[in-house]
Amino acid sequence: MSYPAPFGPVTERERDIVQRALAAASVAADHAGRHDRDRTFPVEGLAVLAGNGYLGLTVPGRLGGQSARVTDLVLGNSALARGDASLALVVAMHGALLGRVRDAGVWSEAHFERVAREVVSARDGTGALINSLASEPEMGSPSRGGLPRTTAVRRGRGWVLNGRKTFSSGAPVLRWGVVSAAAHVGEAEPYLAGFLVPMSTPGLRIEPTWDTLGMRATGSHTLVLQDAEVDLSAEVPRPAAGGDHLPHERAWSLSVAAVYLGVAEAAREYAIRFARERRPLALGGRSIASLPNIRDRAGRLDLLLFQARGLLVSTARAWDAAPSASMEAALAAAKVVASNNAIAVAEEAMRLVGGSSLDRGSPLERHFRDVRGGLHHPPQDDAALALFAREALD
């Protein structure tokens, strides 16, 4: 599907980023079905991204990256997701974390430079990935607030961490996790803290618990910390609740929503190709693309995608041009429309293709499962609707 220029890559840099993503997507697509079935991480595509510098896009230019903007990753991640959604999701989380930390300036320069330089220099294997590890069995979504059950106790010249983190996306291939914990220092009240924890830290282990409907290859297993010791310097500053960082988090979430847009685009491509090639005997050699009901469904697919991509990309471009806290509702709307329209596209594609879309070997069946994960990224629909209502009525 082709889009008018504002909704696709416009600058030479944007085109280059999309081409890097497509190079990895092409490799990853050949292995996506196997990794989905076996719940293994798509290392083949990740190796391409490590080699071509995609993993360091959001690192500042002064540290060897490209200072990529939200729009760059929206365009790149949607292209990457057409090959393998699980790979794209983990890479999107990595890039978004680096981007929002860079833009909001919430870490110390020493912390950020240490991570950034390793990210841009790791050009082989699985590269150097980072992700936020915040979810817990009893806590629910971290975006809803609450103090973690995971603890970090100040002891001597370091911290001792104990707890469990669920939804640890990319766990098998991460170099670091930013672990949220309740920090205990002496008799003082515990406070919410974040810790930059190397995944090689003794006392840290991964329980292979990830067995889900969709996004099966993300390796989002349970991380167990049992007397895991880190240096005193591992604590990274956490922004205050409701601070200036929040709009940056919302803005960079668009680069994650773009993954689900890309999955929907892959579902659309499969359905359109099927319609053009399917020639039942009853049609005397004509393809089903000539049937009015099929053409109606094809039109619905593209209408939904134009809506989703148009709002997502235009909102990202608006943010990059003039970041503002006043855009919170627009950012939420772009995410919600992208994730819900993506689900609608996958469902419409299955209706167009018919019963064969249910085959476990069909990429469309995988797209249908993967795309549903978009509902569970913040802001979830109910939080977005509450925001819209507050702005309209209060």
Where do the protein language model's features map onto the residues?
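Glycine-rich phosphate/cofactor-binding loops in nucleotide/flavin-utilizing enzymes
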Residues: 355-394
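Glycine-rich phosphate/pyrophosphate-binding beta-alpha loops
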Residues: 166-171, 252-255, 374-377
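Glycine-rich beta->alpha junctions and the first turn(s) of the following alpha-helix
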Residues: 211-304
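Register-specific recognition of a single heptad position within extended alpha-helical repeats
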Residues: 8, 12-15, 255, 285, ...
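C-terminal helix-coil-helix/basic helical segment that borders enzyme active sites and/or dimer interfaces
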Residues: 33-36, 306-337, 350-358
